[in-house]
Amino acid sequence: MTVIRSEALTLEQLKAEHPTMTHLIISPGPGHPLKDSGISIPAIDYYAGKIPILGVCMGLQCITVNYGGIVDQAGEYVHGKTSPILHDGKGLFKGLQQGVAGTRYHSLAARINSLPDCLEVTSRTEGGIVMGLRHRDLVVESVQYHPESILSDEGKLMLANFLSWNAGKWSDLPDALTPAGSHVPHAASTLAPA
């Protein structure tokens, strides 16, 4: 694994210095994705469809704006607080129980009514704030909360799910989008708009 600051190099340098990259994680950071994300958005645009991409916090926001959605005030400021996460049981969430605790550090979120058709909501808070997005065709997943936080549940399983993917298109990974049986009671109803 190599950690690279998004403002430390250009996309061309990233491609030249890491020609065999197998996965891309766009990690958290302060600010707004349109002003403060370095090469994150161009990297998403370039690598989408080639390798799996995971966005965390600002990473979700970068994915949102890359595909034409809007990131705006979430309506609440949460820093270091946990919320139950209602999810679809697929992709990153495969094998996770409903209501898994997610640690949140954000004041911005994807505006639900701005999302393009290519992105689907995969998880929400009980109050309806978007906590996860997935590209419908490309292996691009994201969460607004921090699965790597000590206060979040099942972060290791989510990372294992992501690292198990070896393609850039969901059509090449059909099992990834098949829910893991009994772990997802009434997933469709839990993701209905609040």
Could you describe each region identified by the protein language model?
Residues 1-54, 67:
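Flexible gly/pro-rich beta->alpha loop and the following alpha-helix that scaffold active-site loops
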Residues 150-194:
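Acyltransferase
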Residues 20-21, 41-48, 54, 61-153, ...:
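Pocket-forming structural segment of enzyme catalytic cores
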Residues 33-36, 59, 78, 155:
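Short, conserved glycine- and acidic-residue-centered signature motifs
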Residues 9, 78-79, 178:
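Positions that flank functional sites
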Residues 28-33, 59-61, 147-148:
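Short glycine-rich anion-binding loops that position phosphate/pyrophosphate groups of nucleotides
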